[in-house]
Swiss-Prot record:
This is Acyl carrier protein. Keywords: Cytoplasm, Fatty acid biosynthesis, Fatty acid metabolism, Lipid biosynthesis, Lipid metabolism, Phosphopantetheine, Phosphoprotein. One of its GO terms (biological process) is lipid A biosynthetic process. The gene is acpP. One of its GO terms (molecular function) is acyl binding. Belongs to the acyl carrier protein (ACP) family. It is found in: Cytoplasm.
Length: 78
């Protein structure tokens, strides 16, 4: 698992209060991990802060699973 993937998982566990075993790449923030729309926005903001990047709203809307978050960050974090 990449360093980015591990950080993403840690942020999700901390912010959503879920078990690390629940945070799989296929897991949906809302359907599987119990996040509401505000939680999802807060996750995106935390990813931006942790990785020092800006995620445009139109792209943030497409990040709905753990795997999508990891893939986006691995592409955009230098």
């Amino acid at each position: 698992m990449s360093e980015i993937a591990q950080k993403v998982k840690s942020i999700i566990v901390e912010k959503l209060g879920v078990e690390e075993s629940e945070v799989t790449t296929e897991a949906s923030f809302t359907n599987d991990l119990g996040a509401d729309s505000l939680d999802t926005v807060e996750l995106i903001m935390e990813f931006e802060k942790e990785f020092n990047i800006s995620i445009p709203d139109e792209q943030a809307e497409n990040i709905t699973t753990v795997g999508q978050a990891i893939a986006y960050l691995e592409q955009h974090v230098k």
